């Protein structure tokens, strides 16, 4: 699966010449305000994404695909999509870039929007803040500034509420990724925190008038709403699994903090040794000067005291961002259930 994610990012760069029209004069980069203020998705695209996961997604395995559409002012309209086929690393003959180009060429022949505007991915209990997603979205957004990534959560959707969110990398993070410098000093200079990594773009799902009429008629004929228990509590398995994933990420964060603290202690110790060495040389030079002897030759301190390599902090930011996502999911889950409990209590007191 990792190879497919890496291929996703590289394919965006390879197809930038084909999809350049999607970026209407914005150019490459990520500076300034966000180029996209709203994402409009056709209902057909949502159904295709859901169908793709139901057919090929299982367990922790995620499904991915390409989003097609166009840009109208500050609104990104997603009108079609197609999936990445499931393949293993043994399929050496499979060329993902060639597959995407063939698909877009076929769509162009039948007069369907074929401009590359992003990609989508399913998630497992909200576990999508990863380095692979960051690298892929950077490749897309660097080639096509308006690109977004749609994150589809099948577990939340199965509970009765469609979970589909659009994300983009913030301009600050785009600049840091361009420099490829994830040292503590670079992230501090860019004022990058886990809250300034991804920006969520509002989503609007659009259907034709005929589809809206059909859905209205089906809703009147459906008896599902009458049988649905509005005050039934959600399964505790979701909460337990999310808490387990949260604890795993907290453990990873603790290990990363230990590594960083070790680096800081070693750096501080080295600075003290360097300062003591300079003082000893200065005292010895003063003694040699008093005896009329020449001072000691200059030495390259960087060779004597090789600076420790600072640990990259991007992984720590990603872990912190994932922890924040888990906390938001737990907050949303518990808020819904607590609301149902209070409503059930009020109804019971009213009927008694």
From Swiss-Prot:
Residues 22-32 have a biased composition (Gly residues). GO terms for cellular component: eukaryotic 43S preinitiation complex; eukaryotic 48S preinitiation complex; eukaryotic translation initiation factor 3 complex. It is found in: Cytoplasm. There is a cross-link at residue 303 (Glycyl lysine isopeptide (Lys-Gly) (interchain with G-Cter in SUMO2)). The keyword Cell division does not apply. Residues 39-173 form the MPN domain. Residues 8-21, 270-289 have a biased composition (Low complexity). Keywords: Cytoplasm, Initiation factor, Isopeptide bond, Phosphoprotein, Protein biosynthesis, Ubl conjugation. CDD domains: MPN_eIF3h. The modification Phosphoserine is found at residues 3, 183. Component of the eukaryotic translation initiation factor 3 (eIF-3) complex, which is composed of 13 subunits: EIF3A, EIF3B, EIF3C, EIF3D, EIF3E, EIF3F, EIF3G, EIF3H, EIF3I, EIF3J, EIF3K, EIF3L and EIF3M. The eIF-3 complex appears to include 3 stable modules: module A is composed of EIF3A, EIF3B, EIF3G and EIF3I; module B is composed of EIF3F, EIF3H, and EIF3M; and module C is composed of EIF3C, EIF3D, EIF3E, EIF3K and EIF3L. EIF3C of module C binds EIF3B of module A and EIF3H of module B, thereby linking the three modules. EIF3J is a labile subunit that binds to the eIF-3 complex via EIF3B. Belongs to the eIF-3 subunit H family. This is Eukaryotic translation initiation factor 3 subunit H. It comes from Bos taurus. The gene is EIF3H.
